[in-house]
Structure formats: structure tokens, C-alpha cells
């Protein structure tokens, strides 16, 4: 099983992606800001449940920074397709992580009250099949929290490096989620603050045919704190409403029978 899973990963992600992610995930403004938004949304989900200590699964947990945060809200477990990612999680002291693919989760039916898939389903050839697998492991009325990249015209080098299959609009995300057997309770765009800069940079790079190995380097130390605070501040808006556009799209949905 391990070998089959590992060979499904693009070579770039096998050799370079996870070591870089492990180094930057705790401090890079984008990950810090996103994690604060996710934290606020998970707290919102937990408030709707009868159990104050829910069982939570992070699908595609990567090197584990989000999983550590999720442990503040319940019994958090993780699964990732990469043996390298699982090892990095263990280096963080996380021992509730399994090796497995999103399309074949190594868990029993009706196991979790909350499942997160944070920038995961865009990697899948069949995103609806992956969402149905998430539905399988969710308990009745359990919630899934999805975070995905938005708008195909924002396609950039990080999409190529990360082996993305697509970026979403809110209608396309909602359609996939509902087709998989969920009722969407809330959805919005996110990261509106950096929408225009990202659009400009990626458009110029395409126009000039510039290439970069990764976008992780966009982490100017003097601006890292302000950038992360600006991104994270969106959680106060998202707690009360929606954003009309952004670099990402986010969705909370409930499993229905």
C-alpha cells in the first residue's frame, strides 16, 4: 500500500514539497493567516455539535501544522498520501496520523463529527468521489470544512508545482459538494486582500513567460507579520457574512442521508 500511494505523487511533491512545507508552515504569512481563519470556522462548527470534544479528521494533513491547531477543538487525527508527510507529522509529536489517499480513507464508516480538507480536493482527478469518501467517514449530520484555490484565471506556478487539477468558483465548489451528498450551510471566498496582487503577479509571469520553482519564497520577513494579520483579519468578516471574491474559496457542509 505504501509504495502505491507514494508513486501517485508527482515527483516534485515527493522530493521537495514537504520539506519546504515543514520549514515554512509555522511562520509563512499565508499559512498563519489561513490557520487563524480555519480555527475560527472550526470553533463555529463545534458550537453546532452536541459533543464538545468531537473526533476530527484532517484529510491531506501535510506536515501537521493545521492538525496541531485542530487538537484544540477535539480529538484530531490526520491522514496523508505521502509517507514523507507522515514522518514530518511524527517529528511534530503527532502520533494520530495515518498513511492513506483521500479517495480511500483508512477509517470505518461514520467515524468523525468534523472533517477538514484544506487545499486538498483540487489535487484529485475526481473531486466528487473524494468528497463522497469524506461523507462515508462522517457521522450523520457531521460537517466538512473545505478550503480550495479560487478562479482558474489565477492559475500560477504553485498550481503547477502542487499538481492541481483545477481551481474553483463558489458555484462549482457548491455543485461538487452537493453532488457528493452534502447540504451546504455556508460558503464564501477568502483572501480578498491579496486578490489583486496575486492576479497582477501571475498575469505578468504568464505574459513574460517567467518561471519559478515555487511561490513559497514570497515571504518578505519585514512584511510577514502584517501580511498574516491582514489575511487573518478576514475571519471577523467571515464570521458575520461572506466575501464577494478572493484567492481562495471556503465551504462548510453537512452530511445528509
Feature annotation, model-predicted:
Residues 1-110, 114-118, 129-131, 216-221, ...:
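Conserved N-terminal segment of class I S-adenosyl-L-methionine
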Residues 23, 144-166, 170-178:
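Short, glycine-/aromatic-enriched active-site segment of Class I SAM-dependent methyltransferases
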Residues 118-121, 147:
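Residues lining the SAM
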Residues 123, 127:
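Di-metal (Zn2+ and/or Mg2+/Mn2+) metal-binding site signature of metallo-dependent hydrolases
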Residues 128-143:
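A short glycine-rich, Lys/Arg-flanked "PGG" loop and its adjoining helix->strand segment in the class I
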Residues 182-192:
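Conserved S-adenosyl-L-methionine
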Residues 194-228:
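C-terminal helical/coil "lid" or tail adjacent to the Rossmann-like core of SAM-dependent
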Amino acid at each position: 500500500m505504501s509504495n502505491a500511494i507514494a508513486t501517485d505523487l508527482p515527483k516534485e511533491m515527493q522530493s521537495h514539497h514537504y520539506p519546504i512545507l515543514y520549514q515554512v508552515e509555522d511562520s509563512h504569512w499565508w499559512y498563519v493567516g489561513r490557520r487563524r481563519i480555519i480555527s475560527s470556522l472550526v470553533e463555529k462548527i463545534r458550537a453546532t455539535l452536541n459533543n464538545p470534544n468531537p473526533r476530527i479528521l484532517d484529510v491531506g494533513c501535510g506536515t501537521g501544522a493545521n492538525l496541531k491547531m485542530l487538537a484544540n477543538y477535539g480529538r484530531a487525527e490526520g491522514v496523508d498520501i505521502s509517507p514523507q508527510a507522515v514522518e514530518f507529522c511524527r517529528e511534530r509529536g503527532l502520533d494520530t496520523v495515518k498513511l492513506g489517499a483521500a479517495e480511500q480513507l483508512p477509517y470505518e464508516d461514520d467515524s468523525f463529527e468534523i472533517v477538514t480538507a484544506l487545499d486538498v480536493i483540487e489535487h484529485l482527478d475526481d473531486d466528487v468521489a473524494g468528497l463522497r469518501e469524506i461523507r462515508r467517514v462522517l457521522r450523520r449530520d457531521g460537517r466538512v470544512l473545505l478550503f480550495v484555490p479560487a478562479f482558474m484565471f489565477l492559475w500560477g506556478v504553485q498550481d503547477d508545482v502542487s499538481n492541481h487539477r483545477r481551481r474553483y468558483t463558489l458555484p462549482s465548489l457548491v455543485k461538487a459538494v452537493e453532488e457528493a451528498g452534502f447540504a451546504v450551510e455556508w460558503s464564501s471566498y477568502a483572501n480578498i486582500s491579496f486578490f489583486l496582487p496575486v492576479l497582477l503577479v501571475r498575469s505578468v509571469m504568464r505574459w513574460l513567460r517567467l518561471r519559478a520553482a515555487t511561490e513559497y519564497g514570497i515571504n518578505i520577513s519585514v512584511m510577514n507579520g502584517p501580511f498574516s494579520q491582514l489575511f487573518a483579519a478576514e475571519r471577523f468578516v467571515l464570521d458575520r457574512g461572506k466575501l464577494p471574491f478572493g484567492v481562495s474559496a471556503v465551504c462548510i457542509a453537512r452530511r445528509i442521508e
